[in-house]
Amino acid sequence: IFQYATAKIGAILVNVNPAYRTHELEYVVAQSGMRALLSATSYKTSQYRAMVETVAPKIASLEWVAFFDDESYDAILAAAAEVSEEQLRERSAGLSAADAINIQYTSGTTGFPKGATLSHRNILNNGFFVGEMLHYTQADRVCIPVPFYHCFGMVMGNLACTSHGSTMVIPAPTFEPAATMEAVAQERCTSLYGVPTMFIAELS
């Protein structure tokens, strides 16, 4: 939802790897000049609220923080109700295909994460031509268990489908082999995304 919402208003979406530790999150938030941060409070063993509350006071550019499962997220929805459709159309009409729309960061395994700034044209063309290469149509149902913070899920998955009218099937919040295979069977998927380790886990 936020991928499409930020694109519609011309905000730059900064993808954050949920496996980042506090120091990596701090670096990405500061280096990108992030003004707003939306996060889950926790997932499995990761305590995102604690990480964000440690980082936020140190970042001058960060104007507001919201968590999906508390009143701060409700405040976002309330603020959205104050924006008219006409205002949204005017904002969208002023955008250019060359505008920066997304910053994707590396994993940071060999140092601090490195950010790549991408435009509307960059990511939409990438997704479109992936869909063309795979001959996607409105009849296709694509299972996307790969992460959305990376190009594979966000661009080759979401935008390849969107640009061809194909159905996106999202089996679980993070990769779960059994849930993925169940989704493929139940939704009659025509494509399944993944990397070798994921396919090995699914075959096990």
Each model region followed by its residue ranges:
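A short helix-loop-beta submotif of the ANL/AMP-binding
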Residues: 1-14, 18, 22, 31-36, ...
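Conserved S/T- and glycine-rich ATP-binding loop of Class I adenylate-forming
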Residues: 6, 37, 100, 106-109, ...
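ATP-dependent adenylate-forming carboxylate-activation enzymes
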Residues: 11-29, 41-51, 166-187
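Conserved AMP-binding
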Residues: 17-19, 136, 146-150
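Adenylate-forming
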Residues: 39-53, 146, 189-204
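ANL superfamily adenylate-forming
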Residues: 43-97
